[in-house]
């Protein structure tokens, strides 16, 4: 979806940044390491961490709630890890990117995320 974003299409130089920073294509994923964010489809969160951070923000109608949560984890002083040995099998459908409403929700949530956190980076603040 990020690659299909009209802004990325207007500015091809953003494609490399999207691939590297958001899709994490700059490493082979064969080790466990801290990352900026992980997908919300498979997160494991300790009870203590959830008590400190809270729940997912219900203001995100569809999309970006996982990134928002991970930013909140980092801002709390905790870390988000990609665990290379963890696996999950997803069974079922996902909304099609061909539906305008679905894309609208993704774009709306992206704007909401930027308004909430700015251009946050765990490496250098916002």
Language-model features: where?
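Short, flexible, basic/aromatic active-site loop/helix in glycosyltransferases
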Residues: 1-35
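Active-site-adjacent helix/loop segment of glycosyltransferases
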Residues: 67-126
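A short, conserved alpha-helix in the catalytic core of glycosyltransferases
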Residues: 36-54, 59-87
């Amino acid at each position: 979806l990020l690659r299909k974003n009209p802004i990325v299409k207007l500015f091809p130089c953003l494609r490399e940044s999207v691939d590297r920073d958001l899709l994490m294509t700059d490493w082979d994923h064969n080790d466990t390491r801290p990352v900026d964010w992980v997908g919300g489809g498979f997160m494991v969160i300790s009870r203590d961490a959830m008590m400190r951070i809270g729940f997912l923000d219900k203001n995100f109608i569809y999309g970006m709630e996982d990134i928002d949560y991970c930013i909140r984890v980092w801002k709390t002083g905790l870390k988000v890890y990609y665990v290379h040995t963890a696996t999950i099998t997803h069974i079922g459908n996902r909304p099609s990117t061909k539906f305008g409403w679905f894309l609208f929700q993704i774009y709306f949530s992206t704007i909401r995320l930027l308004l909430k956190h700015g251009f946050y980076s765990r490496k250098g603040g916002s």
